[in-house]
C-alpha cells in the first residue's frame, strides 16, 4: 500500500476494518472527520491534488489527472455513497461487486482499502 503511494504511514495493520456504522455516514464532512481520526489526513491531502495532463489528452476530454484514493467495501450502501462521491479518487463498492479493477486500478496492486466487519464476514461466506 505504501509502495503504491498511499500516505498511511502511521497505520500498523492493513487492511483497515471498521464497524458497520460507517455505512450510515451521509455527509462528506463527517467522512473527512473519520479520515482524520484514523490517521489518514495526509492521504486526503495527497488525493486532493489535481494536475493538468501533458499532451493531446487535454483536447480529447481528459484534461485532469487525479490520484486514486481509498476504497470502501461495504455490504449495503446506507448513505456512504453520497459522502464518498465528493472526495476525489475515493470509491465505494459492495462486497458482491468487488473485483480486481477496484482493488488494483491500472493493474497496480496495493490500494488502500477500508472494509466493514460485515463485509469481511460476507467475503468469507462467498468463498
Where on the chain are the PLM-derived regions?
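Extended polybasic, low-complexity segments that bind anionic RNA or targeting/receptor surfaces
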Residues: 1-127
Amino acid at each position: 500500500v505504501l509502495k503504491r503511494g498511499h500516505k498511511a504511514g502511521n497505520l500498523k495493520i492493513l487492511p483497515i476494518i471498521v464497524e458497520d456504522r460507517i455505512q450510515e455516514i451521509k455527509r462528506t464532512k463527517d467522512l473527512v472527520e473519520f479520515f482524520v481520526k484514523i490517521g489518514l489526513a495526509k492521504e486526503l491531502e495527497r488525493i486532493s491534488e489535481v494536475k493538468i495532463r501533458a499532451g493531446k489528452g487535454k483536447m480529447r476530454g481528459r484534461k485532469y489527472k487525479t490520484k486514486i484514493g481509498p476504497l470502501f467495501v461495504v455490504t449495503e450502501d446506507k448513505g456512504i455513497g453520497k459522502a464518498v462521491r465528493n472526495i476525489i479518487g475515493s470509491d465505494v463498492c459492495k462486497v458482491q461487486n468487488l473485483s480486481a479493477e477496484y482493488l488494483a486500478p491500472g493493474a497496480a496492486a496495493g490500494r488502500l482499502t477500508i472494509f466493514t466487519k460485515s463485509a469481511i464476514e460476507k467475503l468469507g461466506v462467498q468463498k
